[in-house]
């Protein structure tokens, strides 16, 4: 399972440095095609979720996005970062994430 969700959504969040209402989220979702958990990243702004993974530009209501991905997956927390917090972690770790957990795949 390989995608670019951490990098794609990381790039978006750092483009929003002056807007703390955007949050970069790292968590675990369930892949619809095989029913198995995977590490994932997305953007939240209030009740809107945006996902720029794999060249897409998805926008859904948060409740629907979480429902489709079965988020939060039992035993896995959703971590949320402001643009500044995300940028600081990117610099400190020298990677896009995840930073606080080891996803199942």
Task: List the predicted regions and their residue ranges.
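A structural boundary/capping signal
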Residues: 1-105
């Amino acid at each position: 399972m390989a995608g670019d969700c951490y990098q794609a959504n990381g790039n978006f969040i750092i483009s929003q440095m002056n807007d703390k209402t955007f949050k970069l989220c790292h968590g675990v979702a369930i892949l619809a095609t095989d029913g198995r958990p995977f590490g994932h990243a997305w953007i939240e702004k209030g009740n809107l979720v945006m996902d720029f993974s794999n060249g897409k530009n998805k926008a859904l209501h948060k409740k629907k996005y979480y429902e489709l991905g079965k988020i939060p997956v039992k035993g896995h927390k959703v971590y949320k970062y402001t643009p500044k917090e995300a940028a600081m972690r990117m610099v400190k770790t020298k990677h896009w994430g995840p930073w606080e957990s080891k996803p199942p795949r």
